[in-house]
Amino acid sequence: KYNIPTAKFGVFNSIQESLLVLNECKFPIVVKADGLAAGKGVYICETHDHSKKAIEEIFNGKFGEAKQILIEEFLKGEEMSFFIISDGVSYKVFGTAQDHKRALEGDRGKNTGGMGAYSPSRLESEKLEKKIIEKVIEPTLKGLKDINNKFKGFLYAGLMIIDDEPFLIEYNVRMGDPECQTILPRLKTDFLDIVIVLFSKLPMVLLKSLLTISTNLRI
């Protein structure tokens, strides 16, 4: 409806329905649990058998009572986490980060909740930020406004950047972890002041970041 660039996808309500679609898929594909999964409900599936196993695990309760799954086109690019804060009227860019989810060296392991991150993303630039705002953030906020949702808080857009173009992979209405552990140390503005402003009628604070790079590693 709002022409936000994303992967081609389908939503499915049963194992049987999902397995029928696999015969038409070009691999690799992405299989996602529709619901909270601590950042672990995404499978990058290289084969039909791997996809079948992922679908069965989700519907059999690995992430709780999943009622739906998403099967998506696999987008090959570089991930970026892009954050804004909104007080329901205006918004400000809160920063970028790059999260590394796969276990083991060389991305050979399974997806995790996050093995580590750094901020800012190495892809960050004024040109790319402008595209993200115009193609993803502002259409999203317009969509929320159109359904009378005055969104207040943090909006985290999980993006795939392909040839300097942003594609939306997911939203979270929170700060990511471990991403927040790399963004917050870079803030010069008091974090409590930011939170107070979000839920009051005070003018949006001026966000200031240190000109540093912050990293986080999980062991």
Regions found by a protein language model. Give the residues of each.
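A conserved helix-loop-beta module that forms one wall/lid of the active-site cleft
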Residues: K1-G41
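Residues within well-ordered alpha-helical secondary structure of globular protein domains
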Residues: E24, E57-N60, V197
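Short, flexible turn/loop "capping" segments at secondary-structure junctions
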Residues: D34-G35, N111, T212
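Internal nucleotide-binding/catalytic subdomain
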Residues: G41-Q181
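Conserved, structured core segments of small domains
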Residues: E165-P166, D177, L184-F199
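Short beta-strand
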Residues: V31-D34, E72-E73, S209
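Residue-level signal for inorganic ion chemistry
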Residues: K32, G113, I219
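A glycine-rich beta-turn/hairpin centered on an aromatic-Pro dipeptide
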Residues: F199-I219
